[in-house]
Amino acid sequence: MAIATPLSTSGRFIVDAHGKRVRLAGVNWYGASEDIGVPAGLDCVDRNTLAELIAAQGFNCVRFPFSLWMTEQTAPVADQYLLCNPDLHGSTPMQVYDACVKALTDQGLIVIPNCHLLDFGWCCANDDTNGLWFNDRWEIAKFTTIWQEIARRYASNPLVAAIDIKNEPRHATVGGAALGPAWGTAVETDFAAMYTMVGNLIHQIDPNLLIICEGLNYAGDLTGVASHRVQLGKANKVVYSMHDYSWSGHPASQSQSAYFQQMNKNGGYILTEGIAPVWLGEFGDNASALSAPGGGGTWWANLRAWLTEFDVDWCWWALNPTHGQSCTPGTNTIKYYWGAPEPYGLLTLDWTSVGYPALVTMLQAMMQPRTGPGIG
């Protein structure tokens, strides 16, 4: 059964149209932000079959990255990338994205568009010039205009219920100057100010959308929220987002209590103090290793314990068993070729079934909300 939208927030919880707690538990399906401009896997599986597979595992949302570049491409996507979706032959990247959004929401899945990059390619690196919402090729006005177009495009689809405004805020070089991300300081790289501006513009078009605001430094730092919250004209619509990986500053032998302390300092306090929801929009690791008994080490055990203890909303990176083609943004250097194996992916290489049932079982154990309005 589809979640009753629109979604809103109630303290630290996301709630549905009836005020009942919703715990977002999803997967990232990537590729549209990369060189070809379409989600990976459409050469292997029909999009409707894939959407059915996602929903059958119990996931209730899909974070769906795109790039600004992709939205402006008017040439048809080469048929070779759409072999199992022949009805999409001759479509532009945005038309393919539209069709995938429809397939996902037809299965009752919440879709969360995410501006993953301005340019196309693989994210992320300190030197990819895509850490801010503007660079030498993309002006601020273009960023806001494209987001307004996205909001308008899906305003009639109630299951496009949230937007993730900018992936992994970080340093970028713009006009020859190295610029760092800021929060609440009223400088040109103030992400809190940008989220407020873009969120309010989007709400003029679709006031129902949740506005997801990622923390600084690769979405690892939400400490600025303590003194400067994102305040939109429409109340109860802000969700903050963190990302966490084994390399996100965690010692190899970190204790669970130390991990909890680190995560709560970085952003979990927003939950414990009842300020707003926090969504762990990306986390993942080698799926084969995590599926093995005792696999994943202390980070994986600590993360699962944290997600469970604090009843956190989350989204696994990634669904994909294979990559789309991706270069380093701003270069022609290929980092991953189309079809290269993605070790973090949940599916078999042919995209037709779950490749790591033990890992999916671990994720399923964290899907149901334990606390919140209307629970228990």
Q: Model-flagged regions — what are they?
A:
Residues 1-4, 16-17, 370-376:
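Extracellular cell-wall/glycan-interacting regions and their flexible linkers
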Residues 4-227, 235, 323, 341-351, ...:
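Active-site mouth of glycoside hydrolases
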Residues 25, 161, 279-281, 315:
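A short, local hydrophobic-aromatic micro-motif
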Residues 28-31, 38, 42, 239-241, ...:
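Glycan-binding loop/region signatures in secreted carbohydrate-active enzymes
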Residues 32, 168, 245, 312, ...:
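Residue-level marker of positions within ordered structural domains that often coincide
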Residues 67, 281-284, 317-320:
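Short, loop-centered acidic/histidine patches that primarily coordinate divalent metals
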Residues 185-290, 298-312:
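Glycoside hydrolase catalytic-domain groove-lining segments
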Residues 290-376:
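Aromatic-rich peripheral "rim/lid" segments of glycoside hydrolase catalytic domains that contact
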